C-alpha cells in the first residue's frame, strides 16, 4: 500500500515501539492504524481502550485509520481511509466495563461511531474489489487536508455542520436549511449561546476550503 499523504510507493509495518500504529510511511512519518471487518462496516466499529483512544485523538500521536472489509473467503472487498484530523471525542462511544469475573475486569473499551463522520471525510481506496486510481486517492487526501483543524472544539463544530450540510437532500441549499438543525446542535453544544452564528462561521470555513460555493443572498451550492 502506498502512502496517501505523500505518495511514497510503499508504507511499512510500524515498529513494535509504536503501539498505536500498524503501518508507517518512512518518507513523511505518517502513521496508520488498520481495522478489519468481515462484511459491512455498519454504523460503528470496535476499537481499544476508551481512555487511551480519547487521549490519542486529543494529542498529535493519533494515526490515520484504514478500514478494511473482506468477504467470507477473506478476499478484500473495500478499503476506506479516515484521516486523523477528523476524530473528535463525540464519535468515540464508551462501552460497558468488563464484568468483575472477566480476565480484564473493569476494563472499558470503545467503539468508533462511523456514522458521526461526514462522507466527505472518508476516502475510498478500494470499492467492491475495484482499486481506485492512486493519484485520485492522493488528490482526495490533499483536498480534505484543507479541512484540518487543530482545535478539538472547532473540529467538532466543523464535523457537525458538515454532517448537517450533507444531510440536506439537494445540491443547492440556503442558510435557513442549515438553521433547521439549530435545536439539535444546541443540545450538543449546550454552553454555546449563539449557535446560528457558529453555523455561519463554519459555512464560511467550508466555503473558503472549496467544499461549498456561496451563491449570494444566503444561498449555497455543494461542490461534492
Regions found by a protein language model. Name each.
Residues 29-48, 52-63:
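Short metal-binding segments enriched for Cys and/or His
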Residues 197-224:
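Charged low-complexity interaction tracts in eukaryotic proteins
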Residues 81-160:
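Long, low-complexity, charged/polar intrinsically disordered regions in eukaryotic proteins
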Residues 3-6, 25-28:
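Short cysteine-rich clusters marking metal-coordination/redox-active sites
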Residues 183-199:
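Short, positively charged loop/turn segments that connect secondary-structure elements
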Residues 177-179:
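A short acidic, leucine-rich amphipathic alpha-helix
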Residues 13-22:
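Short linker/helix segments within small regulatory modules
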Residues 152-173, 204:
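Positively charged, polyanion-binding regions of nucleic-acid-associated proteins
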Amino acid at each position: 500500500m502506498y502512502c496517501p499523504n505523500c505518495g511514497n510507493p510503499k508504507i511499512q509495518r510500524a515498529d513494535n515501539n509504536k503501539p498505536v500504529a500498524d503501518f508507517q510511511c518512512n518518507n513523511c512519518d505518517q502513521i496508520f492504524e488498520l481495522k478489519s471487518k468481515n462484511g459491512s462496516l455498519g454504523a460503528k466499529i470496535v476499537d481499544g481502550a476508551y481512555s487511551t483512544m480519547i487521549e490519542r485523538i486529543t494529542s498529535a500521536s493519533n494515526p490515520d485509520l484504514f478500514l478494511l472489509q473482506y468477504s467470507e473467503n477473506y478476499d478484500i472487498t473495500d478499503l476506506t481511509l479516515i484521516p486523523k484530523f477528523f476524530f473528535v471525542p463525540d464519535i468515540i462511544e464508551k462501552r460497558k466495563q468488563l464484568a468483575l469475573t472477566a480476565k480484564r475486569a473493569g476494563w472499558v473499551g470503545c467503539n468508533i461511531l462511523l456514522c458521526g463522520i461526514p462522507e466527505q471525510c472518508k476516502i475510498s481506496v478500494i470499492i467492491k474489489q475495484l482499486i481506485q486510481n492512486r493519484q485520485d486517492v492522493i488528490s482526495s487526501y490533499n483536498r480534505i487536508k484543507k479541512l484540518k483543524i487543530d482545535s478539538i472544539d472547532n473540529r467538532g463544530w466543523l464535523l457537525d455542520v458538515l454532517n448537517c450540510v450533507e444531510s440536506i437532500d439537494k445540491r443547492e441549499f440556503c442558510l435557513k436549511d442549515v438553521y433547521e438543525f439549530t435545536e439539535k446542535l444546541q443540545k450538543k453544544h449546550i454552553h454555546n449561546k449563539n449557535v446560528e452564528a457558529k453555523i455561519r462561521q463554519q459555512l464560511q470555513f467550508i466555503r473558503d476550503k472549496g467544499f461549498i460555493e456561496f451563491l449570494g443572498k444566503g444561498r449555497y451550492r455543494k461542490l461534492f
